[in-house]
Amino acid sequence: MKPKPLLSRVKSENLPEDIRAAWDKSMSLRGDGTFFEVFAKHPELYRWYIEEFYGKVFQLGKVKNRYKQLLRLKLSTLHGCKFCNQGNRNDALESGLSQEQIENFENQNLDVFSKADLAVMDLAERLSMSNPNGTLDASLYSRLREHFCDAEIIELGFVGSILTGVAKFLFAFDLVEKEEYCPFK
């Protein structure tokens, strides 16, 4: 079901150029641009999210982008964000994840995923909204530490937490379409 937010929207023909470009891409991919129509009410915040969070932390940062794409897709899959999944799958494929890996998120076939991949996906499960008691315990820390330094583990945790918080915002404000299985109706 398409989102029906209470917040007002900016008509597509009145969107700022950068938000209009993102809206066009979303309409082509998803057939919905609600997120961009609403966020156009606060273009400075939208630009911070895209330029500062995505541009500097998510895309650059210390951790290889492939692992952040894996983390993001695992979170959006757990949360049931259809809007997110539609874009995140494409980005994950472009970052080097295989279609087979994406299709095996649930059973986490050890032949398909590396130990680093499995540790990142376990971290995503700890950070997800559906796991309010999730923590970085000694076992997971040890598994992550085999592949990442502390600065990289902090970055993965921070990125995952920001994405989880944004997902909560998107659902609470009804800005995106949800998967049928989404537990957050």
Describe the function of each predicted region.
Residues F105-K115:
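Acidic/His metal-coordination segments adjacent to aromatic residues that form catalytic metal sites
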Residues A116-F158:
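Acidic/histidine-rich alpha-helical segments that form the ligand environment
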